[in-house]
Amino acid sequence: MHVKKGDKVQVISGKDKGKQGVILAAFPKKNRVIVEGVNIVKKHAKPSQANPQGGIITKEAPIHVSKVMPLDPKTGLPTRIGYKIVDGKKVRYAKRSGEILDK
């Protein structure tokens, strides 16, 4: 998967196209990610110990990883990702500027 938890991304297709946010969770086996403030859904929650009132809760739902594109740290624009070996480690870099994404 070309994105990781904590990456700043932009949604490139679907109803939330153009929105930007941080990846809160990634599910590589399902090829899905949860992006902050994107794909908001309403869930009906039964009353429980943690939520004695119950009711309708809004939260982010996963979207397919192909719908998001990482943002270039230098320009702030969406970019494709490449991989290269630096000091014996495989790191991701932004193809738009050449900036390394992994610390």
Curated annotation (Swiss-Prot):
Q: One of this protein's Pfam families, by short name?
A: KOW
> Which BP terms in the Gene Ontology apply to this protein?
translation
Which keywords does this chain's UniProt record carry? Ribonucleoprotein, Ribosomal protein, RNA-binding, rRNA-binding
Q: Which InterPro entries match?
A: KOW, Rib_uL2_dom2, Ribosomal_uL24, Ribosomal_uL24_CS, Ribosomal_uL24_KOW, Translation_prot_SH3-like_sf
GO MF terms, alphabetically ordered: rRNA binding; structural constituent of ribosome
- Origin: domain of life: Bacteria
Give Gene Ontology CC terms. ribonucleoprotein complex; ribosome
Q: Which Gene3D superfamilies match?
A: 2.30.30.30
Q: How does it assemble?
A: Part of the 50S ribosomal subunit.
> Record's family?
Belongs to the universal ribosomal protein uL24 family.
Function per UniProt: One of two assembly initiator proteins, it binds directly to the 5'-end of the 23S rRNA, where it nucleates assembly of the 50S subunit. One of the proteins that surrounds the polypeptide exit tunnel on the outside of the subunit.
Q: What is this protein called?
A: Large ribosomal subunit protein uL24
Protein species of origin: Geobacillus sp. (strain WCH70)
This protein's gene is called rplX
